[in-house]
Regions:
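Amphipathic alpha-helical "coupling" segments that flank catalytic cores
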Residues: 1-528
Length: 528
């Protein structure tokens, strides 16, 4: 135990370790309680037997070489430890006289936060969310009844005598008490582990019921505080929201396929109902407006969209706070994701490049795209394509050229395909672009123009098919086929030709190239 070694070395000038023993009857108490009592309160080392189980032995550290070999010192320390272990055994016995469900009733007397109600209120929200996660198939192979039961009992140990004395054991003791009363192992494990992971590098639970309860608990905390206007700032994070976000991302970025927007809305619904005094009364319009405002836009915080400020709910909740929280959530999670992925060697600018596409809130899919992009962009071919993209983007920016899609938006020209009943509006716009400029190239195209147009015609459907199949390596390969044609285009073609039809066609070709690249990622966000 390195921590106890350092502490004892600092407390003594001439450290002498002495072995002592305590009554075996105390081993009935959970080993973590004995370890905590010995280590934290007494600065003792605990010992294990040959089987690796906790032994009824301890090592204390004296500051002198006693004439009796330390017998008196050991006896004195044994008595002190025995008194503490006696208290612990008393707590253990008293707590087990009630079921966790009976203990949980005491949560109604504990305030979680003035804006978020009692711990009992939080437990109710978490239980419903955990059940929803299972019933919607987001967390698979879990029993919804067990998930809800575990969530309703997860905080019950907060009112027990043992956790009152040893707060560090919250969750852990709940698991022991659950087993002691014969609850299913899946429920006991979920109660024990639902606080995990508590930070980077911590163990991430994999048991389905535990995942449902842990994810629901962390989501409820983050969403609640953000909607209540309580944000982490700088080095201050009094409610450990960054740590909770790491826990959420450990599930949603590594294993669970789920829309973050869907998660946000589901977790926010009970909070919004609470803030707006239940949706059935005057707050209903605000409730619905806030719920529909959730989206996965990491730039939403910078847009400062107007929100209704004329409503003040209970406990100081206002629309200003609610809508500010909604706008800040995507950026908060995006920043946490960058920090989390930095240790895995993933570049933050590539995460930005994929986030900038908008609407990609399945983090498992997003990271798969980012990693494929990083593999490609770090090759010589990828660097060349990035350089070609930036040159094209700079020309288009200088000319304020947005392609046909932008022309329609600026001029308001009626789109002849606007009435086409096609759910894929991008397909409509692409058809419009093709129809509008089909006759513009009424001049002899230079070979490099033909080559780039032909490469785009081949790369666009290949990339679209690969993206639809989530084969991001194949999508990068499709982009790679554009590298040589775009280089040749810049070497052989004068974009800003004097003839307007040539200039327009060539700028449209570059806009088409930029759009093809943007289907994979926004290369303007990539450094280099």
């Amino acid at each position: 135990d390195e921590g106890v070694v350092i502490e004892n070395a600092g407390l003594t000038e001439w450290p002498i370790p002495l072995l002592g023993r305590f009554d075996e009857a105390y081993l009935e108490v959970p080993p973590e309680v004995i370890q905590l009592t010995a280590r934290v309160n007494q600065k003792y080392f605990v010992c294990e037997d040959e089987a690796g189980k906790l032994a009824n032995a301890f090592i204390c550290t004296a500051n002198i070489e006693a004439e009796d070999g330390g017998a008196a010192i050991v006896d004195g320390n044994r008595k002190v430890l025995a008194a503490r272990l006696s208290d612990a055994r008393f707590f253990w016995d008293v707590d087990r006289k009630k079921t966790l469900a009976q203990h949980a009733k005491g949560l109604e007397r504990i305030t979680f936060h003035e804006k978020l109600g009692t711990v009992a209120d939080k437990v109710d929200r978490v239980a419903k969310l955990a059940r929803w996660l299972v019933e919607e198939g987001i967390v698979k192979d879990a029993d919804p009844d067990m998930a809800e039961q575990a969530a309703r009992l997860a905080k019950a140990d907060l009112v027990t005598e043992m956790v009152g004395e040893f707060p560090e054991l919250q969750g852990l003791m709940g698991g022991y008490y659950a087993r002691a009363e014969g609850l299913p192992d899946a429920v006991a494990d979920a109660i024990r582990d639902h606080y995990q992971p508590v930070g980077q590098g911590d163990k991430v639970p994999t048991a389905p019921v535990t995942v449902a309860v842990s994810l629901a608990d962390k989501l409820d905390t983050i969403i609640g505080f953000y909607l209540g206007g309580e944000f982490p700032t700088g080095s201050k994070d009094p409610f450990a929201l960054r740590r909770a976000a790491f826990g959420v991302l450990a599930y949603t970025a590594d294993r669970l396929r789920v829309s973050m927007t869907t998660l946000f809305r589901q977790a926010a619904e009970p909070h919004l109902a609470f803030f707006y005094c239940e949706p059935k009364d005057v707050g209903r319009p605000y409730f619905e407006a806030a719920l529909s405002a959730f989206n996965w836009d990491i730039d939403a915080e910078d847009k400062h969209e107007a929100s209704p400020l004329d409503y003040r709910g209970p406990f100081g909740a206002t629309n200003a706070n609610v809508f500010a929280g909604i706008r800040r959530l995507p950026r908060f999670f995006a920043d946490r994701l960058k920090v989390k992925q930095r240790e895995a060697g993933v570049r933050h600018d590539l995460i930005d490049a994929v986030f900038a596409l908008g609407g990609e809130d399945d983090l498992v899919r997003l990271l798969a795209r980012v990693k494929a992009l990083q593999v490609y962009i770090e090759t010589a071919e990828g660097a060349d394509l990035l350089a070609g993209y930036k040159r094209a983007a700079n020309i288009l920016k200088k000319e304020d050229w947005h392609g046909t899609e932008g022309e329609i938006a600026r001029t308001g020209e009626e789109d002849p395909l606007a009435l086409v009943d096609d759910p894929d509006m991008k397909a409509v716009i692409d058809a419009k672009m093709a129809a509008r400029h089909a006759g513009e190239a009424n001049y002899a195209l230079e070979p490099a123009e033909k080559a780039l147009a032909g490469a785009l015609s081949q790369a666009e459907p290949r990339a679209a098919k690969a993206l639809a199949e989530e084969d991001f390596a194949a999508a990068m390969a499709a982009l790679a086929s554009l590298r040589a044609p775009i280089d040749r285009f810049f070497e052989e073609v004068t974009v800003n030709a004097e003839e307007e039809n040539k200039r327009a066609h060539r700028l449209d070709l570059l806009a088409r190239f930029r759009a093809a690249v943007h289907k994979v990622a926004d290369f303007s966000r990539i450094e280099g």
